[in-house]
């Protein structure tokens, strides 16, 4: 078992990573130890994950003396919206839950983002715990306090920075994850190697097959390394005014794909993979990386069974209209996260639209 701390002064919290954590109530009891007898807890999940894991979590909570209930939501990125957010609010208000309620987000990135935002808003903020069940949420979205819902005009445009009290990662959950969802998570794993840790990228080139066979040691190492990097970055820049923006490699292009094609048609990690190729090609065109480095990035994403192409149905104008709504845009100027090597990246503001178009068009023939 691995344990990592996100250091944010009085808002610091632990990340526990290992196989079989759902079978051990100790991980929940550590978070709930200072709560009341008959502590009210709401577990919020979706219709896919709840039948697999909700009973285990509810059983552990009841063993700890908690008054626990379950809310099941629809499954899919297309449901990360204000309508479903209101369903959560209605459930909490109709149940007369007070400010001392603890909310548990049990699911992937959609559940974590939506439930985290609901926790930030309900009575101006209640405690919540992240229990991520997809690889993408385990290595990325459950850590760092970004919470949000989507708007038809842009992804994650309505949200807040709100940190959980703990993150509990049971790697056994990945045994029930469809391969397409697993691959989507690998896109974020590869991202960490590109932007921050060249040695980890090397390790991924050597050990990718072990991850796909769910080798326990390899999974625990990869998830822990991603969480360590995320924790280090968040501790330095919680609100994304500096280094944290590097975690958005591929996301400016990727969010445009998700918004234009409809949330859920491409998985988030798939869109990030395609966007990473476009960002890397932009770097190559600008002389920031070598041809060999570019080819290594594309080859690893391709080996991971991820899309490296540009969606055929999207024009340059389709990309730009969404990219100009990106949260990194300042004073009307588009800023892109661009790799400057294997293990480093920068936020760069002066890329011409001609270069961006070349990068987008490259992916049509890859």
Curated annotation (Swiss-Prot):
Record keywords: Amino-acid biosynthesis, Aromatic amino acid biosynthesis, Cobalt, Cytoplasm, Lyase, Metal-binding, NAD, Nucleotide-binding, Zinc
InterPro entries per UniProt: Dehydroquinate_synthase, DHQ_synth_AroB, DHQ_synth_fam, DHQS/DOIS_N, DHQS_C
Binding site for Zn(2+): 188, 251, 268
Cofactor binding remark: Binds 1 divalent metal cation per subunit. Can use either Co(2+) or Zn(2+).
Reactions mediated catalytically: 7-phospho-2-dehydro-3-deoxy-D-arabino-heptonate = 3-dehydroquinate + phosphate
Residues given in the record as NAD(+) binding sites: 75-80, 109-113, 133-134, 146, 155, 173-176
Stated role: Catalyzes the conversion of 3-deoxy-D-arabino-heptulosonate 7-phosphate (DAHP) to dehydroquinate (DHQ).
NCBIfam families: aroB
Annotated protein name in UniProt: 3-dehydroquinate synthase
Species this chain originates from: Vibrio parahaemolyticus serotype O3:K6 (strain RIMD 2210633)
